[in-house]
Amino acid sequence: MEALSRHRTARISPQKCRLVADQIRGLNVAAALDLLTFSNKKAAGLVKKVLQAAIANAEHNEGADVDELRVKTVFVDEGPVLKRMSPRAKGRANRILKRTSHITVLVSDN
C-alpha cells in the first residue's frame, strides 16, 4: 500500500530542499518526523507538512497502520522560476532568480 503527497511551487530552492529530503529517504515515518521536527532548516518544515499529509492519506484512504509506514520515495523537482531585477550602478540591472520547488513524498508499508 502506498500513499502520495505533493507540495507544488514551494518558495524554496530545490538545492536547499534536497539536503533535507536526502536525510529522511528510507526512514520509518516516526523517525523522519522526529528528524524534521528538530531540524532548524526552513525546508524541514515544508517537507514535514508534506510527509504528514502523505501519512494522513495512507491512514484515511488506504486504512494503513501508521507504525509500519516508511518513507519509500522523496524527491524535489524544480518549479517555475520567478525572475526579478536588482538595480546596479550606471543604470544597469542584474537578474535575480527566485527558485521554487515541487516536493513529493511517497510512503509505503512494504
UniProtKB/Swiss-Prot annotation:
Transmembrane segments: none
Keyword list, A-Z: Ribonucleoprotein, Ribosomal protein, RNA-binding, rRNA-binding
Gene Ontology MF terms in the entry: rRNA binding; structural constituent of ribosome
PROSITE patterns (UniProt xref): RIBOSOMAL_L22
Pfam family, one: Ribosomal_L22
UniProt-listed GO biological process terms: translation
Cysteines paired by S-S bonds: none
InterPro entries in the cross-refs: Ribosomal_uL22, Ribosomal_uL22_bac/chlpt-type, Ribosomal_uL22_bac/org-type, Ribosomal_uL22_CS, Ribosomal_uL22_sf
Cellular component aspect of the GO annotation: cytosolic large ribosomal subunit
HAMAP family linked: Ribosomal_uL22_B (MF_01331_B)
Function: This protein binds specifically to 23S rRNA; its binding is stimulated by other ribosomal proteins, e.g. L4, L17, and L20. It is important during the early stages of 50S assembly. It makes multiple contacts with different domains of the 23S rRNA in the assembled 50S subunit and ribosome. The globular domain of the protein is located near the polypeptide exit tunnel on the outside of the subunit, while an extended beta-hairpin is found that lines the wall of the exit tunnel in the center of the 70S ribosome.
Family: Belongs to the universal ribosomal protein uL22 family.
Subunit annotation: Part of the 50S ribosomal subunit.
The protein's name: Large ribosomal subunit protein uL22
Gene name of the record: rplV
